[in-house]
Amino acid sequence: MDDDYEAYHSLFLSLLGLCPSKTSIDENAAVFDPELVIAHCFKQFKQKDFRLPQTRRRIIMVPRKEDQTPINPASQPQAPPEPIPSFKALEAKDIQEQPEDRKTWLSRRAKLRQELESFGDVKRWLENKPSITPSEAKVLHMIHEEQSAQTNASQATTRTTRKKGPRLSRQMVPQLQLPKPPALSVMYSYLHSRKIKILEIFHKVGQGENQRITREEFITAVKAVGVPLKNQEVEDIVIYLSSLGKHNTITMDILANTYKQWSMAQQRSSLATARKRYILVKHRDSLKGPLKKQEVDAAPQLPKVDLLTVPAVDTQMEARPMTLEEMEEVGKRYRERQRQHKLMIPSIQYTEQCRLVRCGNRHFDEHCLPSTIHGDMRELIDSTRRHNFLVYLQCWKLCESYGLPLTEDILMKALLYPGDKIIFQMDKVRPIRQPGGYYSDWKVFSPNLALLRSQGPSKSKRTDKKPPKKSKKMHFKEFEEFTRKLKVRRSSSLQQTHPNSFWPGHLLDKLQLYLPTVATDRSLALFSCVQHQPHVYPATYHPDHWWPLRNKNYMTRAYYDAAKVYYIN
């Protein structure tokens, strides 16, 4: 040990260059060999083997049973071999020397499993364990399934033994099946005709299907409904229904089943009768066929003529034949023309009288008048008027329900259309005026001049016959007052209607229904009155002699002709 230590120490110092080594002193020695140092450094690693560890094999020796007898009883008992420890890995020689058969290994494993299972109560141990693994849970589940299967098998065996026992001792007594009484079908047909359900008449009984109904309750319920049955017939029904139950009692389930059977029988009988009627009708038609053929054959036949016949002349007009719908339309037009020739009123009034059924309210009647516009717009306008009328009725109901102080007249003015007013002039119907327009063509003239024009030249001649009036002298002030009055008269005489007053719904921007659940929305107004308001900053606030003096971030206005003061920085 000391020699090795000295050699190692000298070698280490020689590497560091602190002292000369023995190898360097030796003249015969070669140059420094690094292999020795590397071998010395990796000496401890070479001792270990970098291979996977060998698999360990556990062998459990089971003791022999006592009842087994030795094969050679005369031979001397040998000492039992020493048990091999369970965690000792066998060498290759031992494995080769002791070959083991597969059957013996399986028998040993089965024996070991039995011993482990009989070691203790596995179910109790697993149930008392605080946390179990998935494999343990699987074993516990298998134990529970085995126990449940054993209990079911034991119950089945007991039932079979119970059922088989009485059969050997006594014979089964045959049960009598009572015939269905005809009164039952009478009762069900009566209830079906009155649209009464059999389960509804027993209102005092509970709703369960297996609820029992006593004899007294059944009889009182049938009498309360008024079924035309005698007491004996009701008793027959009770006896029959009670015989269907287990304990000679009537249940709701029995009533439902019997009623269902009766309804199915009724359907089958109705189908059978309908089939019989169809067969009879078909048989009658088949019998009538040959009789008709015999009558036709019995009719006298006309003698055949060999002469040529004259072709029939086509008296119809050379035109396309009309269909039934076209012929009906032509007839309608013809009748309408004949009616128009006989009438003495205009066509608009006639259509109004024909198409309308008046309700008595003038506003409703004028709103529901058919439009006088021709074309596709007519149908569109009529549909919008009907829709607006329904909206008016809904608004009126809502106002009444919410107690809003909106009268019916206000809603009529706001929602209903005033109607196309028919205007006559010289026994002629004038066209409808446009918004802001006038009914007549005399727009600028006063009413007196218009009357003179309408009266014609005869009345104007009468005015010429009158003597001319004398001219009256007037002062300047009187003349000024007279002209002022004429201006007022002329302005008042002219028709000054607001351009928005014609349209329906021109008050919708002012009239709003206040409902607690509906928010007001001005965008829903169909028509709105546009009024031009004055500008926010009119020119009167800034006269011409006030101008901006500086052009910076702000602008100030000042009087430019005022005295100016200049400062020199």
Curated annotation (Swiss-Prot):
Region (Disordered): 63-85, 147-172
Positions with biased composition (Polar residues): 148-159
Domain of life: Eukaryota
GO molecular function: calcium ion binding
Binding-site list for Ca(2+): 210, 212, 217
Alphabetical keyword list: Calcium, Metal-binding
SUPFAM superfamilies per the UniProt record, alphabetical: EF-hand
Keyword Calcium: yes
InterPro entries referenced in this protein's UniProt entry, alphabetically: EF-hand-dom_pair, EF_hand_dom, EFC12
Every EF-hand domain range: 193-228
UniProt keyword annotation of DNA repair present: no
Name of this protein: EF-hand calcium-binding domain-containing protein 12
Organism: Macaca fascicularis
